[in-house]
Structure formats: C-alpha cells, structure tokens
Amino acid sequence: MEPSSDAPPFELDRFELVLLKRPTERSRISEEESDRLQALHLAHLHALTRSGAIRAAGPFDEQSDQSLRGMAIYQTGSIERTRELACSDPAVVAGRLEVDVMYFYCPKGNL
C-alpha cells in the first residue's frame, strides 16, 4: 500500500535526553546522607520540571544495565544548557550519579 499524497507531513520534535547512571566507583555514605542527597536530587528535578526545562523524568526498574538509574527528557534547546542543568543536580555534584546527555527525537506533539 502506497502512502497517500494527502497524508500530513511527518515532523519531529527535538529534546535532550539525560541518562542518570551510577558511577563505577563511588564512596560509601551513611543512610542519612543518602536520604539527604535523594531529597535534594528530587527537589532539583521538581524545580526544573516546574520551570519547563524538564518534560518528563523518572527512575528505571528491572533494567538489564544496573548502572542506569533513571532518565529525564529536557527541552532547553541545547546539549550544553541541558548538561549544565543536569550536572548541577546535587547527586551529580556529590558523585552519586553521572549523566550522559544526547538528543532525542519523537513525533511532533507527543510530549
């Protein structure tokens, strides 16, 4: 079946995808410090979501690569700005998480 010539054009929106990963080497910290950093991490993500920089974020479960902890879809317009925001996360600053930033495309209007 051939595509219809009156089909709407397929357009993509561009976002920045941040993968949050557990570093291969990280020091042990107390449960209290871990809880404190987690609260600061969540507050950071919440503030970026409220500001509109993050469109969606959340943790992974049952992933094959246990170093992958979660992801966030940003819309800042640049990898550099997204990396700056992601690297200011208190859990990243403390060395508990690392970030991998890349562009992510999805059909226009899906997010």
Language model feature labels by segment:
Residues 1-111:
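Conserved, structured core segments of small domains
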